[in-house]
Structures are given as structure tokens and as C-alpha cells.
């Protein structure tokens, strides 16, 4: 699948991180809408899986860096380095959101403080995804230095996060209308298809003296088709019951999540496979 497979730790880190951010926002809205403490507590217990996935993502990122010490060293240039900003933003999001979950799950969270804390965690998640996109806005890598990168990362949030949250809320047996979020995911899929087409067309005009962007991943078109098929199948696991006015089963939602994550990981592998440099970067 092109040259992007060697960046599999980053594929896992970015996709899972973006999925968790989207799921925290939607499940958090469900938590706000819960009618009693028992419902809220069941939602909080289900949110354990968000922080489990976030932990897996961070373990993958450490594997990419080689050792935990390098992760600490990479924080030396916060404010000046995109990588430092990303790791700092992700660590703060993980710490603040994870601590909210821990205090909430043991039942020690005052409701007013819990609402403010959760809202703050959601905002930190959005900042984390934004910092992720900034890492790849490198002017000497024209295949990444564009709006498609930013769109792709935030579309992953909208594609994978809501269905994970829907599974958590359904497993918690909470009455909550997830249809608006399913519609948002469908709109994100349409936008994703548009990005795929436009970016594919733009590759023909990107080249260096030794490389042509369109030749970096020969199977780009066919793999993107498979990606869209997986995304459609995954969303179908959520949409079909809703169209029939039935509640989706947790197993169906989990299957849909797996299919969507698989599709987004294919897209992210292609993203890393499109890496190419033009000119020289000058450190500031």
C-alpha cells in the first residue's frame, strides 16, 4: 500500500486520537442530556473505552519516537515546533479528560464542576486535532501543505467519533437521539469523497525534479475506492436501523466502528505514502 505502511504507529495515533475527540464530544453531549445520575454514571463507565483507545494511540506514538525519553525531549520547543505543540496538546487533553473521567467514575465529581470540566476537555480535544494538522503543514512537502490535510483530519473526527459515542450511549441504555450525529457523519462522508476527488486531481500538478506526486502511490485510486466502501458499510451499520426507526444494536455499531476505522486507516496510510519534499526547509 505505497510507502505509508512504515508510518503505522502514526496512523494508529492520529486516527484513534481523532476518533476519541469526536466520541468525547458526542458522548459528552449525551452526558449533559442525561435525565438522572444513574444514566450519567453508566455513560461515564462506558467512556472508559475512550481513554483506553487514547492510551493505545499514545503507546503507538511512543513507538514511532523510539522511546519515552524522546517523547519528553520533543517537548523542548513548545510554541516553536509543531511536533512539540502536538504532543503537549495531546498530553494535556489526555490528562485533563482522563482525570475528569476518573473523578466522575468514582462519584466524587460535583455536577456543576463536572460540566465545566467536561466542556474544557472537549475544547482541548479540538485544539489537539488542530495541533495535529499543524505538524504536517510543511511548506517543503507540497502534498501535505494544503487545506486537504486539515479537512481530512477533522473529517475523521466526524466520521469515526459519533459512531463510537453511539455505541457507548447504546450500551449504557440511555435514551438519546443520535440521528442528528448520524446525519453529520453522512455529510462528512460526502465531504470526504469530495476531498478524495479534488486531492487526486491536484496530484498531477505537484512534482519535483525527481518525483511526481501521482506516482508515489500507484494504487491511490483503487485504495480510495476501498476506503469509501468501508466507510459506507460502516455508516450503514448505524443508519439502516435508524431508517427503519429501530435502535441500533451495540454489536452493529461496533462492527460499523471497525469498518470506519479501517477505512480511515487506509486513507491515513495513503496520506503518509504521499510524502515528498521540494526545496529545502530552513529552521527558524
Swiss-Prot record:
Chain ranges on the Periplasmic side, renumbered to this chain: 1-9, 67-86, 137-148, 202-222, 272-284
Protein's cellular compartments: Cell inner membrane
One Gene Ontology cellular component: oxidoreductase complex
Transmembrane segments: 10-30, 46-66, 87-107, 116-136, 149-169, 181-201, 223-243, 251-271
Residues on Cytoplasmic side: 31-45, 108-115, 170-180, 244-250
Membrane disposition: Multi-pass membrane protein
One Pfam assignment: DmsC
InterPro entries listed in its UniProt record: DmsC
Chief place where the protein resides: membrane
Keyword Ion transport: no
One of the record's GO molecular function terms: dimethyl sulfoxide reductase activity
Keywords: Cell inner membrane, Cell membrane, Membrane, Oxidoreductase, Transmembrane, Transmembrane helix
GO biological process: anaerobic electron transport chain; anaerobic respiration
Phenotype reported upon loss of the gene: Cells grow to slightly higher density than wild-type in sublethal levels of streptomycin.
Function description: Terminal reductase during anaerobic growth on various sulfoxide and N-oxide compounds. The C subunit anchors the other two subunits to the membrane and stabilize the catalytic subunits.
Assembly and interaction partners: The complex consists of three subunits: YnfF, the reductase; YnfG, an electron transfer protein, and YnfH, a membrane anchor protein.
Similarity annotation: Belongs to the DmsC family.
Protein known as: Anaerobic dimethyl sulfoxide reductase chain YnfH
Organism: Escherichia coli (strain K12)
Lineage: Bacteria, Pseudomonadati, Pseudomonadota, Gammaproteobacteria, Enterobacterales
Amino acid at each position: 500500500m505505497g510507502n505509508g505502511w512504515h508510518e503505522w504507529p502514526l496512523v494508529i495515533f492520529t486516527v484513534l486520537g481523532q476518533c476519541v475527540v469526536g466520541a468525547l464530544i458526542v458522548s459528552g453531549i449525551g452526558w449533559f442530556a442525561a435525565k438522572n445520575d444513574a444514566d450519567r454514571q453508566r455513560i461515564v463507565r462506558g467512556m472508559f473505552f475512550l481513554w483506553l483507545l487514547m492510551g493505545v494511540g499514545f503507546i503507538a506514538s511512543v513507538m514511532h519516537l523510539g522511546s519515552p525519553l524522546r517523547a519528553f525531549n520533543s517537548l523542548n520547543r513548545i510554541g516553536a515546533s509543531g511536533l512539540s505543540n502536538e504532543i503537549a496538546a495531546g498530553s494535556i487533553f489526555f490528562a485533563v479528560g482522563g482525570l475528569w473521567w476518573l473523578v466522575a467514575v468514582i462519584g466524587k465529581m460535583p455536577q456543576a464542576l463536572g460540566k465545566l470540566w467536561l466542556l474544557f476537555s472537549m475544547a482541548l480535544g479540538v485544539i489537539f486535532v488542530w495541533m495535529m494538522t499543524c505538524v504536517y503543514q510543511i511548506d517543503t512537502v507540497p502534498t501535505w501543505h494544503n487545506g486537504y490535510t486539515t479537512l481530512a483530519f477533522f473529517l475523521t473526527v466526524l466520521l469515526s467519533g459519533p459512531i463510537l459515542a453511539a455505541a457507548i450511549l447504546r450500551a449504557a441504555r440511555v435514551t438519546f437521539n443520535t440521528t442528528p450525529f448520524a446525519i453529520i457523519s453522512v455529510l462528512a462522508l460526502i465531504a470526504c469523497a469530495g476531498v478524495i476527488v479534488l486531492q487526486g486531481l491536484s496530484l498531477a500538478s505537484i512534482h519535483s525534479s525527481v518525483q511526481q506526486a501521482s506516482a508515489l502511490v500507484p494504487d491511490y485510486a483503487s485504495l480510495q475506492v476501498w476506503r469509501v466502501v468501508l466507510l459506507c458499510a460502516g455508516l450503514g451499520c448505524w443508519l439502516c436501523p435508524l431508517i427503519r426507526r429501530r435502535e441500533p444494536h451495540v454489536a452493529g455499531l461496533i462492527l460499523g466502528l471497525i469498518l470506519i476505522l479501517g477505512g480511515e486507516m487506509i486513507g491515513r496510510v495513503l496520506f503518509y505514502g504521499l510524502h515528498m519534499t521540494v526545496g529545502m526547509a530552513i529552521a527558524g
